[in-house]
């Protein structure tokens, strides 16, 4: 946590505590898939992030949500995947982007990672 950082927490009822995940990366048989759910595709805003801090910068554009409906859809899909026990871990990308997220998950899971990111299809940013 960065000096001067504000921590905000929230509480929500969890009807089934067994249908939850933690941020530590778990890869049975040393294989797995990471899903990056972009709530604002094409907008890679890292202002105020750990990545900006590493480079002694503040950044000029902090993470934001352009279309609230995308958050609702992603939340609902995530809840279904949790019920189906498909997800094994979860983490946000707001504090350093995709790379920061993967590193934090690997550190928490006490494991290394090899990541292959395919090129996006034409027209997707």
What do these predicted ranges mean?
Residues 1, 19, 41-44, 64-71, ...:
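Hydrophobic alpha-helical scaffolding
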Residues 21-26, 46-52, 90-93, 102-104:
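Composition- and surface-driven signal marking solvent-exposed, interaction-prone regions
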Residues 1-9, 58-63, 75-125:
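Glycine-/charge-enriched secondary-structure boundary and capping motifs
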Residues 25-39, 45-68:
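Flexible beta->alpha loop and helix N-cap segments adjacent to enzyme active/binding sites
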Residues 1-44, 115-125:
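Phosphate/diphosphate-binding loops
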């Amino acid at each position: 946590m960065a000096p001067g950082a504000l921590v905000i927490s929230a509480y929500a009822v969890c009807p089934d505590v067994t249908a939850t995940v933690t941020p530590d990366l778990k890869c049975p048989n040393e294989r797995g898939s990471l899903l990056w759910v972009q709530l604002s595709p094409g907008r890679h805003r890292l202002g105020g992030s750990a990545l900006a801090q590493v480079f002694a910068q503040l950044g000029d554009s902090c993470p934001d949500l352009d279309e609230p409906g995308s958050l609702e859809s992603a939340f609902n899909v995530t809840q279904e995947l949790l019920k189906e026990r498909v997800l094994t871990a979860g983490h946000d990308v707001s504090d350093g982007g995709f790379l920061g997220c993967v590193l934090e998950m690997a550190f928490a899971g006490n494991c290394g990672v090899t990541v292959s990111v395919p090129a996006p299809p034409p027209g997707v940013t």
